[in-house]
Every structure is written in C-alpha cells, then in structure tokens.
Amino acid sequence: MAKEKFNRTKPHVNIGTIGHVDHGKTTLSAAISAVLSLKGLAEMKDYDNIDNAPEEKERGITIATSHIEYETENRHYAHVDCPGHADYVKNMITGAAQMDGAILVVSAADGPMPQTREHILLSRQVGVPHIVVFLNKQDMVDDQELLELVEMEVRELLSAYEFPGDDTPIIAGSALRALEEAKAGNVGEWGEKVLKLMAEVDAYIPTPERDTEKTFLMPVEDVFSIAGRGTVVTGRIERGVVKVGDEVEIVGIRATQKTTVTGVEMFRKELEKGEAGDNVGVLLRGTKKEEVERGMVLCKPGSITPHKKFEGEIYVLSKEEGGRHTPFFTNYRPQFYVRTTDVTGSITLPEGVEMVMPGDNVKITVELISPVALELGTKFAIREGGRTVGAGVVSNIIE
C-alpha cells in the first residue's frame, strides 16, 4: 500500500497494546498489521520491526515506543506498542501516546499476571477510557474450561479497577498463528479471530471527541500590553475554539477573573477564531497586564477550576535517565511544572510507603503553594533546580 496520502475521511482513533511481558503484545501488533495488509488496509510490519522500538523523549524522559498505523473498514488507527514494562509505565504517565482505548493481551495459557494488573490499574489512573481483551495463545490450551476460567479472572480483575468487566469484549485467538497464516498470504481461522478483535475494537471503543469540539482552554505563555488596544495574552490553544466576543475566564495562581475576547490574532493577522493547536494572541477587554501571568489559563467559564491539593500517579526518573541519585520521602518539596509554569508543592507518600527510589512509580498526594487550573488527567513534570526528576498525571482532585 502506498504511503503517500493520509486518509482523513475515516475517523481517527489512538490505541495501544498493554499487558504482561511475553503474553504476546508485540506479536499481536504484528498480526493485526499483517492480517489487515491482506485486505489492503495496512502495511505489513514484522515482529522485529516493531520490537526494535525507537527511543523518543517526552518531558525529558526517554521512552522506547513503536508506532504502527492501519485502517479497518470504518476507521484509521494509530497503534502504539512498547518493548519493556518500564516503557509502558512512562508512556502512560507522560501521555506520550494518548490512548483512546487499549487492547489488553492476556496469555490464555498463563492467565492474568502482575503486570496485567498493573497495566489495568495504570489505565484507570491515567484515564484510558476503554479496554478490549485479546486472550492470546489459545492454540496452547486444549481445555475449554481453563479458557473460561481465565476469561472469568480477567473480567473480575477489570471490575476490581472499575472497568465494566462483565461487558468487556473478550476475543480468544493466537497472534502467532494469525501472523504465520498472513505471511503465507491468507486469512485463515486464526486471522478471522484477529479481524473479529478489530471489529470489537471498532464497535466498543468510541470515536473520541476531536480537540476542536472540546471546551476552550489555552495556557498563558506571555502577556503584552499594546497601547490603545489593551492586553494581549499569547499561547498555544490546548483544546476548543475561541472567537471574538466570547466570554472567558482567567484561572490559576490568583482569584478567577472574567473577561471578554476582543480580538484573536496569529502571526500579526486578525482571525475570526483560533482553534486547538494554533499559537495565538488573544486580546482581552478591560484586563490589565499585571493581572495576568504565565501559568494561568484562559478557558470557557466554569470549565476548569483552580486547585492546590491532588493525588497523582508518578514515574520517578532513574539515575541513568538523569534523575535523582537518592530516594525521597514524605515532605519532599520539588517544583511541579504544569502546562507553562513551575509551582512548588509538598509530597505525601501513601501509608506504608517509607520512601520512593529513582525508577519507581507510585501514587502521591501533593499540596501546592498556589492554586493551578487542574482536572483529572492533567499532566505535570516534577522538577528540581530546573531538571526533570519525574513525571505524573492527576488521578484525583482533593481540594
């Protein structure tokens, strides 16, 4: 299939494979691309191609990730696969690869394992909204009862982490067999199971709202005063659309203020509207330059509120990644870099956790010295003297 054009006519969805090491995530990724390539919907990627994941940097953290793309009859998918468990943890916490849904791969021969549980928990914490399950290595299980037992265990595990375990689609098959069939040039009985899995992914994982359809939010990067025109705030619109005449709120650091947009410009040109992804200057009516600062956000009124205290799931960089060389304890006070600014905060570790070592991932409670616009899923970096020592995501807002 030629690579030249990106088909924009089909809705786009981001997914990824998750699950325990050696349960077949990468083999399944290869099998999906191989089976769909026979239908002219993907380029075949073999296992080694995917397993040799290039390293990427996201928020100062090196993560090995493979990206493959393919289509079904209904959608265009970007699919991410990570070689190592630590890469998954980092990927999910930094949001390097935002997932609209995930395919949880569980070996039917082994059942759920520690990382199966950990990936489900992480999915819950970082807000992966939907999971579809592939029970792999079905060809190695002769006993139908054993297969049913594993399925039941997986459903219970999903329910334990507040996913709808009873309603989750679970497809059994063999990624390796499907891949072998596809390499021989046909979609056989195992390939059909992969197609069935993709049909479930199509049906069960909803098409995400596009960024432009969400409520308006723009982190403030800079503030200028233009003689005779008023105050301009600049930044990159994170989501939604802003138009002249819109009422907006300025949230974070200080008390929330309301104002009206009197102009939107990009590269010195006036625009009717700015939308997600645009770098714009927004002119605000009656707002003084000293009332706005970097680290605040402009948003649709009532859509996001300032908070000081929250719980977060964090990954702490190892020494090799340029992180700390020593553990930290409760009352550690680093800076939390949220969107465009650093705010000092103090960390409380969960009960029973004495200290956190470089390379760990853990749930923490944070209390910031000044309030910042936060919501579930807001990403942050943890910094010490300007260098990144960790990354996290807000999993619960306390006050």
Curated annotation (Swiss-Prot):
Which residues of this UniProt protein bind GTP?
19-26, 81-85, 136-139
Region feature G5, mapped onto this chain: 174-176
Q: In terms of domain of life, where is this protein from?
A: Bacteria
Q: Which UniProt keywords apply?
A: Cytoplasm, Elongation factor, GTP-binding, Hydrolase, Magnesium, Metal-binding, Nucleotide-binding, Protein biosynthesis
Instruction: Extract the ranges annotated as region (G3).
Output: 81-84
Which compartments does it reside in?
Cytoplasm
Might you give the EC number(s) for this enzyme?
3.6.5.3
Q: What is its main location?
A: cytoplasm
What are the disulfide bonds? none
Keyword Metal-binding included in the entry's annotation = yes
Which residues lie within the region annotated G4? 136-139
Reaction(s) catalysed (UniProt annotation): GTP + H2O = GDP + phosphate + H(+)
Which positions are annotated as binding Mg(2+)?
26
Give the start-end ranges of region G1. 19-26
Boundaries of each tr-type G domain copy? 10-209
Sorted alphabetically, the Gene Ontology cellular component annotations on this record are: cytosol
Q: Could you state a single Gene Ontology molecular function term?
A: translation elongation factor activity
G2, as annotated region: 60-64
Supply the enzyme class, top level.
hydrolase
HAMAP family, sorted? EF_Tu_B
Instruction: Please describe the quaternary structure of this protein.
Output: Monomer.
Q: Which family does it belong to?
A: Belongs to the TRAFAC class translation factor GTPase superfamily. Classic translation factor GTPase family. EF-Tu/EF-1A subfamily.
NCBIfam families in the record? EF-Tu, PRK00049.1, PRK12735.1, PRK12736.1, small_GTP
Function of the molecule: GTP hydrolase that promotes the GTP-dependent binding of aminoacyl-tRNA to the A-site of ribosomes during protein biosynthesis.
Write down what this protein is called: Elongation factor Tu
